[in-house]
Design a protein with these regions (language model features):
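Alpha-helical transmembrane bundles and membrane-interface segments of multipass inner-membrane proteins
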Residues: 1-185
Length: 185
């Protein structure tokens, strides 16, 4: 039972979007900061537990990125609705996730069952998204966070989102090309 702890943590992170969205809707940015911080730390914790104790499961390989995407998209949607993040950034994040989803479905339907394989640039993008979310929330809570840090975070998230999209498409297109033209098939 304890070997499923990382999966439970991922599920809780996904569910954390409900109180987080409510807090953001109420402009309770300080409270939202701490909920987001816990959710961000839970992403590190579930991955560490799974790898450290060998509790990696096929379900966890799917739950973790789904929880991450749900968390990031809901948070940036609420930030955009509250005027704290640009709408174009939300749409860029959604476009990246749509590309990943469609690519995953295409791979699964046309080539082979898909094994979730996070890329380093994808992990960096998620880290920057969570960090930027925390910086935006700290700024909105009127803590001593300069607006320039918010702007830098938004720029870094945008760059990482585009770069990781290109990286995923390039990587999986190359794998698909090799698989399609492999002499063994």
């Amino acid at each position: 039972m304890i070997r499923h702890l990382p999966n439970a943590i991922s599920v809780l992170r996904g569910l954390s979007v409900v109180p987080l969205a409510v807090l953001l809707a109420l402009d309770a940015y300080a409270y939202a900061f701490f909920v987001a911080l816990l959710a961000g730390l839970s992403d590190l914790l579930d991955g560490w537990l799974a790898k450290r104790f060998g509790w990696v499961t096929p379900a966890g390989a799917w739950l973790d990125p789904i929880a991450d995407k749900l968390f990031v998209v809901v948070c940036f949607a609420m930030l955009a609705l509250n005027g704290l993040a640009p709408h174009w950034l939300l749409w860029l994040i959604i476009a990246r996730d749509a590309i990943l989803l469609l690519g995953s479905l295409a791979w699964h339907w046309f080539l082979a069952p898909l094994e979730v394989q996070p890329r380093r640039l994808g992990k960096l993008t998620t880290f920057l998204e969570v960090l930027t979310l925390l910086v935006v929330l700290a700024n909105a809570a009127n803590w001593d966070v300069a607006l320039v840090y918010v702007q830098i975070g938004i720029a870094l998230v945008a760059l990482a989102t585009v770069a990781s999209s290109i990286d995923y498409v390039w990587h999986w297109a190359y794998k698909a090309h090799r698989k399609k033209w492999s002499p063994s098939e």
